[in-house]
Amino acid sequence: MNLVPIVVEQTNRGERAYDIYSRLLKDRIIFLGGPIDDNTANLIIAQMLFLEAEDPEKDIQFYINSPGGVVTAGMAIYDTMQYVRSPVATICIGQAASMASLLLAAGAKGKRYSLPYARILIHQPLGGVQGQATDIEIHAKEILRMRQFLNEILSRHTGQPIEKIARDTERDYFMSAQEAKEYGIIDEVYDVRK
């Protein structure tokens, strides 16, 4: 069962009840708390587009606690982050693994953060396919192409050479928040909100 807390707010018109995510959205906060799939991506994209329409100059705060997920769904979020005029600040809480680490790195320069005990994981894309040999070959070429462009994106956002990214993503590469800062995935480790 998935419980969502309700927040009650006093206004000049009386009480108003919001689910917690709607209340956070009023403060331009988007929360990714779980695997990235098409449904999650669509919700996050819709929230980003809404907040940009409300005020394209104001920051969007994107909190991430995710094990990663479907690359195409993650890329839809990534493209939207780059597309909207509002700067997207990223904040890692808990973990940003796989596709989620790329989203963390894709935040606006100078506005990519992590809490001190979060962990960050980068690696190459995973995939599995079965079927005819020709179809397997097609999918193998696609996952190799995907690995290349994901490495290029990570290189662009971290400032690391593509060769280092390719080496480091060959296997699971875990980082602490401080290590992620040194790597260029984030800009700052926060203990307390400023």
Swiss-Prot record:
Catalytic activity, reaction form: Hydrolysis of proteins to small peptides in the presence of ATP and magnesium. alpha-casein is the usual test substrate. In the absence of ATP, only oligopeptides shorter than five residues are hydrolyzed (such as succinyl-Leu-Tyr-|-NHMec, and Leu-Tyr-Leu-|-Tyr-Trp, in which cleavage of the -Tyr-|-Leu- and -Tyr-|-Trp bonds also occurs)
Keyword hit for Cytoplasm: yes
Active site residues per record: S98, H123
Protein family membership: Belongs to the peptidase S14 family.
Biological classification of the source: Bacteria, Bacillati, Bacillota, Clostridia, Eubacteriales
Enzyme Commission designation: 3.4.21.92
Compartments it resides in: Cytoplasm
Function statement: Cleaves peptides in various proteins in a process that requires ATP hydrolysis. Has a chymotrypsin-like activity. Plays a major role in the degradation of misfolded proteins.
NCBIfam families: clpP, PRK00277.1, PRK12553.1
GO CC terms of this entry: cytoplasm; endopeptidase Clp complex
Record has Transcription regulation as a keyword: no
Keywords per UniProt: Cytoplasm, Hydrolase, Protease, Serine protease
GO biological process, one term: protein quality control for misfolded or incompletely synthesized proteins
Protein name: ATP-dependent Clp protease proteolytic subunit
GO MF term list: ATP-dependent peptidase activity; ATPase binding; serine-type endopeptidase activity
Stored InterPro entries: ClpP, ClpP/crotonase-like_dom_sf, ClpP/TepA, ClpP_His_AS, ClpP_Ser_AS
Subunit architecture: Fourteen ClpP subunits assemble into 2 heptameric rings which stack back to back to give a disk-like structure with a central cavity, resembling the structure of eukaryotic proteasomes.
